[in-house]
Amino acid sequence: MSTYLKFAGLGALACLVASCETPGTQATRQAATAHGRRITNVRTTAYTHTERGGRRNAVGKNLSGQGHVSAAADWSRFPLGTKFQIVGTQDRYIIDDYGGALVGTNTIDLYKTSRGAMRLWGVRRVDIDILEWGSKQMSLKVLAPRRKNGLVRRMIAGIEANKS
């Protein structure tokens, strides 16, 4: 009987502790992985080349749907060249693009090769493993000539504020 009470008490304590975690801390929870860092509860959306931006990414190359697939993000949060994998899948991506709606968010926009695949993805929250962090210096080099754009200026300010 006393063993049962101990387990019941531990279970109740675990539930209490878990319920104290707020959605904000869940969204930014990070853990070390073999490759770098796991980031949990990342909001992802999808885009494709038939949308306004066309087939080229921010560095002027074709969007990639193979190997490390193209992805867009706020470069002050995920610098140009950041490679990551969606946990539990073989899906690997590289940040080689950005989008105005992503600036100031932790959202990553995943490239899909068709509108159907883009719609099928929709909006999902996923855990990602950072395989390799991109370069803040390269991000700044690409963004500097585009400084007239207000959203680009916000990314540049974010990168410069987080240089470490």
Feature annotation, model-predicted:
Residues C20-S164:
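Solvent-exposed, well-ordered loop and adjacent helix/strand elements within mature globular domains
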Residues M1-A8:
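Bacterial N-terminal signal peptides that target proteins for export
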